């Protein structure tokens, strides 16, 4: 079966909004009898895309003609499509029929050796699908040699042509060198594509220049 994964090592509210819009299309127009999963290591983070989807659903079907929402699920009753959350707090992580997974901020996954109970549960839920889609949208974190580090290493090998994997699509937004962070402010757009339009540009500037600079620069 064709399995597709996207690693997007840059996240913002705009990325969450795009993921929610994509899920909304599936909720109303997707194949019936499927589950869509909003996953993260933390339940609060898993809620972000899920709540955005709920807000869009309310605006499109405010009278709940074919859709509904409770504390844990967003459903299309007519087509039997369910959008739910999955996190480390979820007790039962099996028995799903997932067609698409949105894994948000996977840098928080701190399990050793690149393992992730959440990601594995999602893949098990997609095992019966011919073309499941697993989207991993995250910023960089501080957990070394964990799930995200392993995925980024694999992504770079795919990008550089070391590994031939037609089912793995990676978009990595990062600086070319650490030195350019301090020496070329215009280069920040490489790792923060939205910075030229974002209201937090001043905050980024303050954070970077208030941090201790490497002694080698």
Predicted features along the sequence, with ranges:
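Inter-Walker segment of RecA-like/P-loop motor cores
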Residues: 49-99
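Catalytic P-loop NTPase motifs of RecA-like helicase/translocase cores
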Residues: 13-14, 93, 109-110, 143-144
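Conserved Walker A/P-loop ATP-binding site and its immediately adjacent core
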Residues: 34-53
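Non-catalytic, compositionally simple segments
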Residues: 115-217
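Walker A/P-loop NTP-binding motif
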Residues: 19-31
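Walker B catalytic acidic pair
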Residues: 104-108
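Walker A/P-loop
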Residues: 2-22
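Conserved H-loop
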Residues: 9, 41, 139
């Amino acid at each position: 079966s064709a399995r597709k994964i996207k690693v997007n090592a840059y996240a913002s509210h705009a990325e969450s909004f795009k993921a929610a819009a994509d899920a909304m299309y599936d909720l109303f127009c997707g194949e019936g009898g499927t589950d869509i999963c909003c996953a993260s290591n933390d339940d609060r983070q898993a809620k972000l895309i899920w709540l955005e989807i709920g807000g869009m659903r309310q605006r499109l079907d405010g009278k709940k003609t074919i859709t509904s929402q409770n504390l844990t699920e967003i459903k299309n009753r007519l087509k039997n499509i369910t959008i739910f959350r999955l996190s480390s707090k979820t007790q039962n992580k099996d028995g799903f029929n997932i067609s698409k997974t949105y894994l948000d901020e996977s840098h928080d996954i701190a399990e050793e050796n690149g393992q992730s109970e959440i990601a594995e549960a999602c893949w098990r839920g997609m095992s019966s699908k011919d073309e499941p889609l697993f989207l991993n949208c995250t910023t960089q974190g501080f957990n070394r040699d964990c799930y995200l580090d392993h995925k980024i290493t694999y992504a770079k090998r795919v990008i550089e042509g070391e590994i031939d994997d037609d089912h793995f699509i990676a978009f990595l937004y990062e600086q070319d060198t650490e030195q350019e962070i301090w020496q070329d402010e215009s280069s920040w757009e490489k790792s923060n594509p939205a910075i030229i339009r974002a209201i937090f540009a001043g905050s980024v500037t303050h954070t970077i220049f208030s941090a201790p600079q490497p002694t080698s620069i």
